[in-house]
């Protein structure tokens, strides 16, 4: 994305507060091609999403082929809104911001999609906050990860687990989670 460098700084504590989002959780969705360019010491071309709308829904070889074709359009003068940056420099900035602010998280787009058990649903575009659960989304559906926990100590009676109480708690928690999804 053409604005990645500004995006990386959204959680910084310094600078113009109008350009900060202190409460927003942000992430970088990194394709394998970018990492290849980092390793090779190559350049990364930043595009406007309006000029490359299909990249969002591609991964792996399909993403790589489309991305390289857009770079050819830049070279041929067909695309004029772009910026080339050293991939390693951009990677270092991503890591610096992650270390400094805890954001944006880094998640790898291609492995998430290649290993997705839900490829029939479409391309994975995001994950939950901890990035261990991938979420399928599209123009009509937004995915949300609802988390919950059970305090097992509260289910002990004379040092033994009260299975009936635990079953009721889990059932109630499951219904509340389901209701939260339906009414959201």
For the regions a language model picked out, list residue spans one by one.
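Long, well-ordered alpha-helical segments
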Residues: 105, 146-149, 167-183
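Active-site cavity-forming subdomains of large catalytic enzyme subunits
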Residues: 2-163
């Amino acid at each position: 994305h053409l604005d990645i460098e500004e995006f990386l700084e959204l959680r910084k504590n310094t600078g113009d507060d109008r350009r900060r989002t202190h409460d927003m959780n942000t992430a970088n969705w990194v394709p394998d091609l970018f990492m290849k360019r980092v390793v090779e010491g190559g350049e990364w071309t930043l595009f406007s999403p309006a000029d490359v709308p299909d990249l969002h829904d591609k991964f792996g070889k399909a993403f790589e082929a489309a991305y390289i074709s857009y770079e050819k359009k830049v070279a041929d003068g067909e695309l004029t809104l772009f910026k080339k940056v050293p991939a390693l420099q951009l990677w270092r900035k991503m890591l610096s911001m992650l270390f400094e602010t805890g954001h944006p998280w880094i998640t790898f787009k291609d492995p998430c999609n290649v290993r997705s058990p839900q490829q029939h649903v479409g391309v994975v575009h995001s994950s939950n906050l901890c990035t261990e659960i991938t979420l399928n989304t599209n123009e009509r559906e937004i995915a949300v990860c609802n988390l919950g926990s059970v305090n097992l100590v509260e289910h002990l009676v004379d040092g033994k687990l009260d299975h009936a109480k635990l079953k009721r708690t889990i059932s109630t928690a499951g219904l509340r989670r389901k209701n939260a999804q339906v009414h959201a």
